[in-house]
A protein has these predicted regions:
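Cytosolic, membrane-interface loops and tails of multi-pass inner-membrane proteins
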Residues: 1-7, 58, 62-85, 184-209, ...
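Extended hydrophobic alpha-helices typical of membrane-associated regions
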Residues: 5, 228-291
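Intramembrane alpha-helical segments
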Residues: 8-9, 48, 56, 75-171, ...
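Small-residue-rich segments of transmembrane alpha-helices in multi-pass membrane proteins
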Residues: 20-29, 79, 143-159, 206-209, ...
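Residue-level recognition of pore/gate-forming positions within transmembrane alpha-helices
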Residues: 26-27, 50, 98, 124-127, ...
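Helix-coil boundary and interhelical linker segments in multi-pass alpha-helical membrane proteins
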Residues: 28-48, 102-118, 153-174, 224-240, ...
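Multi-pass membrane catalytic core of lipid/isoprenoid biosynthesis enzymes
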Residues: 48, 66-120, 197-244, 277, ...
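Alpha-helical transmembrane segments of multi-pass membrane proteins
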Residues: 50-61, 127-130, 175-180, 187, ...
Length: 291
């Protein structure tokens, strides 16, 4: 019988950074929305929905990869790969997460509920199929980035009742895509040797030696797009932009460090955690100005 610890690991809820990296773009959307700051109940529903959807995505990933994960050093101890959770239990938990996500959407404010439901339904195919992309697409991280884009669209629709957000919405959405492609490419860099051996595709393999530079460009574009969205919404001030520049420089520095030849495998996980912190710092700067 699966233990509570194994189920938490299957959902990835035992690692806060993995959940925050989805909730940070949702926060960007909520606090750069014209209706900001969001009401406390809406914020709670968005957090709960984000946990449910990310949990469902992680389970779907492990179901797709249950025969590959035992062959990869980083993933061989995952609950399904190690046999600590059975297939039926994983499927039931996946359905429970999807049901919880549906209930969250139905609890959202009425003006945007129908649109959020449509967006949630549109999210399902890419979220559930993303794990298969590494089998047929050279840049599966683009699929994940597209999935992450809904973490901006759904909160924005829930807060404002529509997607008529103009350039601020477009910029926040683009920032989420660029940031996600960057950090997930780094995540894939730790598995390059195993992926090459197993015939699995990734942007880290496809980009080769230029991967660190591309990641740096993605982070730079994300920081610039968010800055433009903040400026369009009237945020600013010397202290704000100085802190923003420091955070953006930190993101770029972390990316450029990836070009070192002596990096241990653990460095990629550390990079992932630091990106969560830097993305949250950008959100914190927005929060400080929006209240």
């Amino acid at each position: 019988m699966a233990t509570a610890r194994a189920l938490l690991e299957l959902l990835r809820w035992h690692r806060p950074s993995g959940r925050l990296i989805l909730l940070v773009p949702a926060g960007w959307a909520l606090w750069l929305n014209p209706q900001a700051p969001p009401a406390a109940p809406l914020l709670g529903w968005i957090v709960l929905g984000g946990l449910a959807v990310s949990g469902a995505g992680c389970i779907a990933n492990d179901l797709w990869d249950r025969r590959i994960d035992p062959l990869v050093e980083r993933t061989r101890n995952r609950p399904l790969a190690s046999g600590r959770v059975g297939l039926l239990t994983a499927v039931i938990l996946l359905l429970a997460c999807l049901l919880l996500a549906l209930l969250v959407v139905l609890a959202l404010p009425a003006p945007g509920r129908g649109l959020c439901l449509a967006l949630a339904v549109a999210t399902l195919p890419p979220v559930l199929l993303y794990p298969s992309a590494k089998r047929w697409f050279a840049f599966p991280q683009l699929v994940l980035a597209f999935c992450w884009g809904f973490a901006v669209l759904i909160p924005w629709a829930a807060a404002s009742g529509s997607l008529a957000g103009g350039w601020p919405l477009v910029l926040v959405w683009f920032a989420s895509l660029a940031w996600t492609f960057g950090f997930d490419t780094v995540y894939a860099m730790s598995d390059r040797e195993d992926d090459r051996r197993l015939g699995v595709r990734s942007s880290a393999l496809s980009l080769g030696a230029v991967a660190p530079a591309v990641v740096a460009i993605c982070y730079g574009l994300a920081a610039a797009a968010l800055a433009a969205a903040a400026w369009l919404q009237g945020l600013g001030g010397l202290g704000f932009w100085l802190c923003w520049a420091i955070a953006a420089a930190g993101m770029l520095r972390e990316a450029l460090q990836l070009g070192r030849l002596d990096l241990p495998r653990s460095a990629y996980g550390i990079h992932f955690s630091r990106q969560v912190q830097l993305g949250a710092l950008l959100l914190g700067l927005i929060l400080a100005r929006r209240g």
